[in-house]
From Swiss-Prot:
One of its GO terms (cellular component) is cytoplasm. Belongs to the transcriptional regulatory Rex family. Pfam families: CoA_binding, Put_DNA-bind_N. One of its GO terms (molecular function) is DNA binding. HAMAP family: Rex (MF_01131). The gene is rex. One of its GO terms (biological process) is negative regulation of DNA-templated transcription. This is Redox-sensing transcriptional repressor Rex. Homodimer.
Length: 209
């Protein structure tokens, strides 16, 4: 996907398209129009056509898109056959939920290990995932783990990120309110659930449908 040099906004929508196309394929549907895609994923059809245009001719005018072809294309584009191994740091309520879920709908993403400081959790398995002490972070993180999920208290998020920067981790999904400072070779996606909720409430009050 990096080699395509597509806009980041488009890249963020690709997994959404892929998930819907997977469902279409499972239902036996052979083709789909941009209008049908638009209705399903709540992205306007012009944006979908523009997103798809970055990859060449994925469909035919008047016919739409071949579902099996799209499925194969996005599977390759999103590296669905390559497993991305993930570490989770912080086994609180949210972290525990992630361990039980473990992205079962994503064939190419899997949490391999978790870290915490709680004596009750260290040395156990949650959702089949081993939980190690945070002191063992650098020792336990193998070279093939390149993504980390942070669900630690905000007060320690930066120090954990600093330690991750010394490993082979190149991507951090940050669920803490802290805004982290890391080197340019590490990509961070911030997901602040409180901010998202406040934004939703604001839109409900000020932009009623």
């Amino acid at each position: 996907m990096e080699q395509q040099k597509i806009p980041q906004a488009t890249a963020k929508r690709l997994p959404l398209y892929y998930r819907f196309i997977q469902n279409l394929s499972l239902s036996g549907k052979q083709r789909v129009s941009s209008a049908e895609l638009s209705e399903a994923v709540k992205v306007d059809s012009a944006t979908i056509r523009r997103d798809f245009s970055y990859f060449g001719a994925l469909g035919k005018k008047g016919y739409g898109y071949n579902v099996n072809y799209l499925l194969s294309f996005f599977r390759e584009t999103l590296d669905q056959d390559d497993i991305t191994r993930v570490a989770l740091i912080g086994v609180g309520n949210l972290g525990t939920a992630f361990l039980h879920y473990n992205f079962t709908k994503n064939n190419n993403t899997k949490i391999e290990m978790a870290f915490d400081i709680s004596e009750e959790k260290v040395g156990t398995e949650i959702g089949g995932i081993p939980v190690y002490h945070l002191d063992e972070l650098e020792e336990r993180l193998s070279s093939d783990i390149q993504v980390a999920i942070l669900t630690v208290p905000a007060t320690v998020a930066q120090s954990v990120a600093d330690r991750l920067a010394e490993t082979n981790v190149h991507g951090i999904l940050n669920f803490t309110p802290a805004r982290l400072n890391v080197s340019d070779n590490i990509r961070i996606h911030h997901i602040d659930l409180a901010v998202e909720l406040q934004t939703l409430v604001y839109f409900l009050k000020n932009y009623p449908q």
